[in-house]
A protein has these predicted regions:
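Short amphipathic alpha-helical interaction segments
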Residues: 49-62
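A short, conserved structural fragment
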Residues: 61-74
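Short, cationic-aromatic polyanion-contact patches
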Residues: 74-89, 116-120
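Short Cys/His-rich metal-coordination motifs, predominantly Zn2+-binding knuckles/fingers
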Residues: 88-90, 107-108
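Cysteine-rich micro-motifs
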Residues: 100-111
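Short acidic, hydrophobic short linear motifs in intrinsically disordered regions
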Residues: 23-46
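Positively charged, polyanion-binding regions of nucleic-acid-associated proteins
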Residues: 2-28
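Cys/His-rich microdomains that often coordinate metals
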Residues: 94, 111-112
Length: 120
């Protein structure tokens, strides 16, 4: 499993968590996440679910270590809300938890804006 695949899955999983939390869901079954990703994201539509599940292990460990998620057995719970922010330098869309530093996950730039921008 490549570093690129892990970073990409990290972004898609954060996107999934953001969207689900906005719909009121904050607890997830660890085993169902690969299937959910394959169903909801065209990127993983034809993915091998066992491979996707293996790639998800370091991603989930990273999110737990960064206090985005907490693990209770086979259940993953969000520790707070995720903010969707766009980097002013590279335009990357970041999904950051309150506990994480407000820096771009791609270029480490600190100038992040709400995405989409709020209308005045």
């Amino acid at each position: 499993m490549s570093d690129v695949a892990i970073r990409e899955l990290n972004w898609y999983l954060r996107d999934h968590l953001f969207r689900q939390s906005n719909a009121g869901k904050t607890a997830f079954q660890r085993e169902s996440l690969p299937g959910d990703m394959a169903t909801l994201y065209l990127r993983y539509k034809n993915a091998d679910l066992s491979q996707l599940s293996q790639t998800m292990v370091p991603v989930i460990e990273d999110l737990v270590s960064k206090k985005v998620l907490e693990q209770d057995g086979k259940v993953l719970r969000m520790r707070g809300r995720l903010a969707r922010l766009q980097c002013a330098k590279c335009f990357y869309i970041n999904y950051l938890a309150e506990a994480e530093p407000r820096v771009c996950l791609r270029c480490q730039h600190a100038d992040l804006h709400d995405f989409p921008k709020k209308k005045a």
